[in-house]
Each structure stands twice: as structure tokens, then as C-alpha cells.
Curated annotation (Swiss-Prot):
Tissue expr: Expressed by the venom gland.
Protein name stated in the entry: Long neurotoxin 20
Function: Binds with high affinity to muscular (alpha-1/CHRNA1) and neuronal (alpha-7/CHRNA7) nicotinic acetylcholine receptor (nAChR) and inhibits acetylcholine from binding to the receptor, thereby impairing neuromuscular and neuronal transmission.
PROSITE patterns (UniProt xref): SNAKE_TOXIN
Record-linked InterPro entries: Snake_3FTx, Snake_toxin-like_sf, Snake_toxin_con_site, Toxin_cobra-type
UniProt GO cellular component terms: extracellular region
Length: 88
């Protein structure tokens, strides 16, 4: 009986997702961090500000439940695998 109970506990732990394991790179530190539950997309936004000619485009990386909406003069890409939004 104890063996059956232990087996059921192990199977339950294996089958349940006890934590969100999906991760994306996030700014400002450009390091991989876990996403919140329900956020299963990684995104990269890039755009030019007034310093673009000196230091290049501004980059924003993060997690999202849906791909962020298009914005004028901003490039937005989304992907759905762990850490797929590497810094361009």
C-alpha cells in the first residue's frame, strides 16, 4: 500500500507543472529570467531615439502572453521557445 501511495505521489509531481519553466531574455540586464504564468512568448522591440546615430537602436527584451502590438517606427518580433529573443 505504501508503495502504491508513493508511486501516485511521484506520478502527480511529474505530471504537474509545479512552476513556470518558460524563460526569456529581459532588459535592462539582458539575462534569462523566468516568465510569469501565462506568458509563453518572448519579444524583442527595437527603435531609434535621438541618440541612435551614436549608440545604435534601443532594445527592449521580455516576456508576453501575446505579441505586443505594432507601433510606428518600432520593430517587434516574437518567438515561442525558451530564450529565443537573444540580443540582436
Amino acid at each position: 500500500m505504501k508503495t502504491l501511495l508513493l508511486t501516485l505521489v511521484v506520478v502527480t509531481i511529474v505530471c504537474l507543472d509545479l512552476g513556470n519553466s518558460f524563460s526569456c531574455y529581459k532588459t535592462p540586464y539582458v539575462k534569462s529570467e523566468p516568465c510569469a504564468p501565462g506568458e509563453n512568448l518572448c519579444y524583442t522591440k527595437s527603435w531609434c531615439d535621438r541618440f541612435c546615430s551614436i549608440r545604435g537602436k534601443v532594445i527592449e527584451l521580455g516576456c508576453a502572453a501575446t505579441c505586443p502590438p505594432a507601433e510606428p517606427k518600432k520593430d517587434i518580433t516574437c518567438c515561442s521557445t525558451d530564450n529565443c529573443n537573444t540580443h540582436p
